[in-house]
C-alpha cells in the first residue's frame, strides 16, 4: 500500500505505562510498528526493530501498536516481557481508531511506518537487514 503523496494522520495514544504520545507535538521522526500478540513474524521482528532503533536511533520514538480487540493490556504486557522489550514501547489501540487511519482496507502485520511531520518516510510490511539499512538512511 503506497503512502506516496499522502499526509500521515494525526493521533494520540497512551502506552501501557500511561505515557501519552501525541503525533502533533513530536518534532522528530517517529516509527510505528503495528502488531498483535499471536503474529509469528511480529514475534521475530519486534525485538529486532527495538534493538536496531535503540542502537541507531535512540532518540526517535518507537511505538508498537496493537489494534486487535481480543488482545488485552495484560496480554500485551506478557508479550513485551516474553520478547524482553520494555512495556513503555507498547500501546493498545483499544477501538482500532488509530490503525484505521493508517490502513484503507485490510490491515497487514507487521506494518512498520516512519513519519516526520506531515510526511511518510517509509512504509514496510515486515523487515529484514536490507530494510533496516534503508530505515537507517531514511531517519
Regions found by a protein language model. Name each.
Residues 1-23:
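N-terminal "domain-start" segment that seeds a small globular fold
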Residues 7, 28, 107-109:
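Short, small/polar residue-rich loop motifs at catalytic or cofactor-binding pockets
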Residues 31-32, 62, 112:
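Hydrophobic beta-strand anchors of alpha/beta hydrolase catalytic cores
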Residues 43-83, 96-100:
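Structural microenvironment flanking redox-active thiols in thiol-disulfide oxidoreductases
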Residues 80-111:
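Short, internal strand/loop/helix patches
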Amino acid at each position: 500500500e503506497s503512502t506516496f503523496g499522502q499526509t500521515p494522520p494525526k493521533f494520540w495514544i497512551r502506552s501501557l505505562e500511561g505515557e501519552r504520545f501525541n503525533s502533533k507535538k513530536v518534532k522528530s521522526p517517529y516509527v510505528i510498528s503495528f502488531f498483535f500478540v499471536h503474529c509469528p513474524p511480529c514475534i521475530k521482528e519486534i525485538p529486532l526493530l527495538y534493538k536496531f532503533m535503540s542502537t541507531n536511533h535512540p532518540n526517535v520514538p518507537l511505538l508498537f501498536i496493537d489494534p486487535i480487540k481480543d488482545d488485552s493490556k495484560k496480554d500485551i504486557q506478557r508479550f513485551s516481557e516474553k520478547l524482553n522489550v520494555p512495556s513503555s514501547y507498547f500501546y493498545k489501540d483499544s477501538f482500532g481508531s488509530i490503525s484505521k487511519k493508517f490502513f484503507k482496507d485490510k490491515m497487514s502485520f507487521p506494518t512498520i511506518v516512519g513519519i516526520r511531520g506531515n510526511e511518510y518516510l517509509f512504509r514496510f510490511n515486515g523487515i529484514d537487514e536490507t530494510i533496516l539499512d534503508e530505515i537507517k538512511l531514511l531517519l
